[in-house]
Amino acid sequence: MLRLGWFSTGRGPGSRNLLKAVMDRKLSGDLDIEIPFVFCNWSNKEADNPKREQRELFFDMVRGYGIPLVTVSWTEFMPELRKTDEAAWRIEYGKALREAVSPYPFDLGMLAGYMLWMDDETCEEFDMLNLHPALPGGPKGTWQEVIWQLIAEKADRQGAMMHVCTEEWDRGAAIAYCGFPIRGPGYDELWEDLDRKLETRTLEEIKKAEYLDNPLFLKIREDGAKRELPLVTETVAAFADGRLRIVDKKPADRNGFLDGAYDLSDMVDRALGVE
C-alpha cells in the first residue's frame, strides 16, 4: 500500500477537488493507498485570514475522511525572523514541518495546492511531487505566464506534468505528464483570429488589453485545467501499482530508470472521455 503524504494550503475549491478525486478512487477500491495525514500551513485560527471559510470547508473534508490534520501556521511561526531573514525562517519552518509530520511515515508526498516554497532539507529528505501546468521542458512560471509564452512561441502542444519538488522551484525532474494538441479543430480559428489582431498590434499590446480574456488563452487554459485532476489521480495510481517510482529524485519503473517522464496522456484522455 502506498502511503501518500498530503500537503495543501486549502485555500479554495481546487484543494478540495484534488483530495476528493484521490479519495473517491481510494474508497471505490481503485487505489491501494493510505493518506496518513494532511498538512496545512494555516491553523485557521489566524486573525488575518481571508480564506478562513474556504479553508474550514477543506478542514471539514479532511476530518470527514478520518485523516489526521496537521497544521503549523506560517503566519504565526517566528514572525520576527521571517521579517528579517526569510531564508533562515524557511529553514526553521521546514524543521517544524518535518517534526509535525514525523509521527506519520509516508512513501510519497503530494503538494496539492501547497503555496509555500519547501526548504532544501525537506526536499532532500522526502520524495514529493508538485503539479506544473506545462509539458516537460516547457515554460516555467504561473499558468498564466506559461500560456502566454506558448502563444508567443506559436506552440503546437500544451500539457501538465508532475515533477519532483527540489530546492530549485519548478526545476525538479518531470516524473509523469499528459499532453494535448493546441492546433486543429477548435484551435485553428483562434490562432487565425490572433494573426488578424497581430496585423495592427503587437502581441504585448494584445496581452495587456485582453490578458485572461483572450479566446485562445481561455481555450488553452480550459483544456489544460480539466486534465489536472486526472493527471494527479493517474500518477498516484501508477505509483500505487508499482508502474512508477522515484529513485535518486528521477523517474523509474520496476526495471530501472526511465529515459524521461512517464506519459499518461492516453489514460488522462480516457478518464475525460476524449477520443
Region roles according to the model:
Residues M1-E275:
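One-carbon transfer enzymes
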